[in-house]
């Protein structure tokens, strides 16, 4: 899932610590929402929602329909600004590769969002259907239920889900640290290479000067 370059959402900034928009960005998003709301009902129906997501993402028709059903909590065929705001935060978190951190910071809302039946647990099927929203790979999904389904009922309650988000965040931080260390190591190797080039260049100049003096 990717945002369309140059679309309105491309210019919104998400705080990387709390995974929320600033008040200024929320106000801008609210104005944008009202522009999309051509019927002036303070809601977006499925048609408006489809055209919006088709314009700002590369999601297909089936995925857009699934997201609408996920956000239409009261099953009235419309979503309000609150649901719209949640969606935008998810899209921006995905764009900034903050999916794990977003789930950790907002574990309760995400859990309630994926708990489609309202039974205070999430099944593997729900995760499978919506894993594209949080960039969860198939193997990660299998590992999730193998490692965190403590009760063994193939369902995650909130505590199990929270443990999963903590683990993912720690893993993500460790992955970023290792990537940063590798980049630093490459930079050091580049500097060593530059120093060696300088040394060889100076050595060449010095040898040339000695040769010139011997001729004289």
Swiss-Prot record:
InterPro entries: EF-hand-dom_pair, EF_hand_dom, EFCAB9. One of its GO terms (cellular component) is sperm principal piece. It comes from the Eukaryota. Ca(2+) 1 binds at residues 60, 62, 69. The keyword Translocase does not apply. Testis-specific. Auxiliary component of the CatSper complex, a complex involved in sperm cell hyperactivation. pH-dependent Ca(2+) sensor required to activate the CatSper channel. Sperm cell hyperactivation is needed for sperm motility which is essential late in the preparation of sperm for fertilization. Associates with the CatSper complex via direct interaction with CATSPERZ, and senses intracellular Ca(2+). Together with CATSPERZ, associates with the CatSper channel pore and is required for the two-row structure of each single CatSper channel. Component of the CatSper complex or CatSpermasome composed of the core pore-forming members CATSPER1, CATSPER2, CATSPER3 and CATSPER4 as well as auxiliary members CATSPERB, CATSPERG2, CATSPERD, CATSPERE, CATSPERZ, C2CD6/CATSPERT, SLCO6C1, TMEM249, TMEM262 and EFCAB9. HSPA1 may be an additional auxiliary complex member. The core complex members CATSPER1, CATSPER2, CATSPER3 and CATSPER4 form a heterotetrameric channel. This is EF-hand calcium-binding domain-containing protein 9. It comes from Mus musculus. The lineage of its organism: Eukaryota, Metazoa, Chordata, Craniata, Vertebrata.
